[in-house]
From Swiss-Prot:
Localization per record: Vacuole membrane
Organism for this UniProt entry: Arabidopsis thaliana (Mouse-ear cress)
Membrane topology annotation: Multi-pass membrane protein
Protein name (Swiss-Prot/TrEMBL): Protein DMP4
Tissue: Expressed in leaves, flowers and siliques, especially in vascular tissues.
Amino acid sequence: MEIKVDEGHQKGTKEDITRPLLEEDKDFPDIERTTWIQKAIGQTFQTTAHLANLLPTGTVLAFQLLSPIFSNGGQCDLVSKIMTSTLVAICGFSCFILSFTDSYKDKNGTICYGLATIHGFWIIDGSTTLPQELSKRYKLRFIDFVHAFMSLFVFGAVVLFDRNAVNCFFPSPSAEALEVLTALPVGVGVFSSMLFATFPTTRNGIGFPLSSK
């Protein structure tokens, strides 16, 4: 008995075998595509992690720890929004003011932290007093204000990368606002990294690596 095979069915089977799998859904590669904004975000996440090292460690950790709690995971009511705003303001002020702090190691190897002033160096705990000539080396300079404001901008970029904070302040952003929220921290990160690389800080204050001085 001869078994006849439908030539049309056989031909279709061969075509199915030889046809590339992805050809069945030509739209599938679209899933793999990323916009220029997404690529920029991916690169800037690494930049932000590097820039976070330029900020006081305790301040960044405090913000990252408390942000999801204060913002209720990004689902803010009036109280949560006030708490999150207060957290951002306090951490931002901390980044700014700690840029003027420095450390000093005395003859006994004790680390003393202080605040740079226009007259010299003020030891915070008052445990010691530096000689006038040595104190003048730590006095306030113009570059300290540059670093302070740049630290504030960097912290702002860190806040914009925090989804809890962004969803709290901008729960339903428009398309234009979303573009700004996405592109702004990228620009701040690149600009700040260039300035910090060009004008590196010589201070080792609170929340920064200890000074060898």
